Each structure stands twice: as structure tokens, then as C-alpha cells.
Amino acid sequence: MSEKIRMLPAVEARALDGTEYRLPSDLGGERNLIAVAFERNHQDDVDTWLGDFAALEDEHTGLMTYEMPTISRRFSPVRGVLDGKMADAIPDPKTRARTITAYTDVGRIRDSLGLPDTKQIAVIVCDRDGVVSWLALGERSDEAAADLRAALNG
């Protein structure tokens, strides 16, 4: 029996700088390294990966890095307020441009990525078709970072 292919499904999203995206096709890299967060308290776990994200993007031509807060579509009416608060907390324009919020069916994202739940962040590498070639859950560990580096080098 073959393993289920993990996918980043098609979703409308917007970066904190206002750029509209149709994911995954509008992602900027041949390969895209994305920290997918599901809860506000996940930002600390995302932050543990950001040093690796910056270094790997410098080392790998065609790799782009993103943060993707994934929020239930029921919060769409207050998107401006929520995105505004996130943008205010991020002084760096490059980081705002790479933080893409998706107000969507969170369960659909979870299921397409093959996640058991949304209690942890998912760090993924995917192409512009959404095919996930690497995935780790939770905060950075040395083992997960080494595995990511090997996947990108392989």
C-alpha cells in the first residue's frame, strides 16, 4: 500500500503587506519552506525555526520561506483587525511580505497535509503544485533541522 501524498491545497490568502496569493501556485520558490501555524500561541514554535529558514534560503537557490498563520474562516469578518495586529508586531517589511494569512477551512488544510490535529505547527517543503516533499511537526529540534537540511540537499 502506498503512502498518501501530502499536499498544500489550493487556498486564497494574503500576505501582511497586502499581496494577494492563490496558494500554492503563487508561491515564489521552486521549493517553498513554510511554517504553518494554527493557533496564536504557535508563534513561539515558529520563531524557533526562523534562523534555519534564513540560512537555508541563503544556501539554496530557488528556495523561498514563509510563515502561514492558518485561521478559521469564521474569523474572516475581522481579518483586517487580526492581520493589522500581526503586521504591527512585525517591523520588518520582508517578514510581513512572507507572512501569508489563510482564513479558510482549517480541517481541509490539516487533512491535506496528513496531520493528526492542529495542536502543533507543521513545517513543510512544497513545490508550486503543493506537493509536500518534507514535513516536521512542532518546534525546532536539532534532529528535525538536520533532517530538513538533508532533504533540501538530497
Predicted features along the sequence, with ranges:
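Short active-site neighborhood of thiol/selenol oxidoreductases, capturing the structured segment around
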Residues: 25-47
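N-terminal "domain-start" segment that seeds a small globular fold
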Residues: 1-24, 48, 96-98
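Structural microenvironment flanking redox-active thiols in thiol-disulfide oxidoreductases
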Residues: 42-91
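Thiol-/selenol-based redox modules, centered on thioredoxin-like
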Residues: 111, 118-154
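Short, internal strand/loop/helix patches
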Residues: 66-68, 81-117
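A structure-centric signal for secondary-structure junctions around beta-strands
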Residues: 8, 28-31, 62, 120
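Short beta->alpha junction loops/turns
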Residues: 39, 71, 137-141
